[in-house]
């Protein structure tokens, strides 16, 4: 099933952009709702991978039904969640982006809002946004060998209401770390610190660091983008590296 090749070139090596344009112009076979499950496929996550998987599912299996389940209220995944100053990609978008919709932005190393807009535009252009159930998270996924089906237990984030859906094929596009519980190391004496401690993964939108003395702990990709961006208003910024 070619869905897993979401970021790979076509198997015959040909440029797929012309065929993509043609496929948008001609009528596609209409999806046929399966009789024994709710959907043929369910994709968990509406970030860059989830939208890519949906595109290839539509392209190679246009008669199959599918649903994208997204816990947040917006498309984008990481690029909707992270709001810290200087947020940008670590890889160039010509490589990181979709081969069926090449990146045309001015900067190859793009900022977070531009990447989010690119993913949203892709979802709209191919009608993928019409297949997303926002504000629902997957609590459990149970496989039955007897019926060859997945049963997913969902929870509506707004009020905790639970429901179940079934499918034949399940694709996890949730990323590789916990969005709700970022890793935070233990620091002795942390409770005695009288300043503000912020994890970049949950950056407050209204936080004003103007005139503040800032210490950034760590020197990874997040710190490398965060430190230069904060020097415009902060009084002093120091990076600590172990």
In which residue ranges do the predicted regions lie?
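Glycine-rich active-site loop/strand segments that organize a redox cofactor
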Residues: 76-121, 242
